[in-house]
Amino acid sequence: MWTLYYAPISCALASHIALEQVGASYEAVKVDFANDAQRGPEYLRINPKGRVPTLVTERGILTETPAILAFVAQSFPRANLAPLDDPYAFAEVQAFNSYLCSTVHVAHAHRMRGHRWVDDPAAILAMQEKGE
């Protein structure tokens, strides 16, 4: 059985949906971002990046949404989550998933996590206002 570490309202939702879609046997473990659990030693032992999603499998630990989605699709080929028989089409799916994670998702990160970039409370507020 796999274990998915996630936080609500995060990009981990895509991995959660994929696992449900294929009927995978997994346990979902909430990482409490409100209490900085992602920065605690227990979670950092699992994922030193301190991010979600993290998928613990019998083969090892995977992080990053595109990697997890590709792994799930390849582990459950009959679910048809991705065009596994066509390398180019599969790469197009990977490109789209990477764009969502590295561009679209990140473009909104400043609203909720301005402290990653600046320490000045006024600058954090300005980033939040810019995102509205």
Please place each PLM-identified region on the residue numbering.
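Amphipathic alpha-helical packing segments from all-alpha helical-bundle domains
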Residues: 126-132
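GST-like domain detector, emphasizing the conserved glutathione-binding G-site
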Residues: 1-126
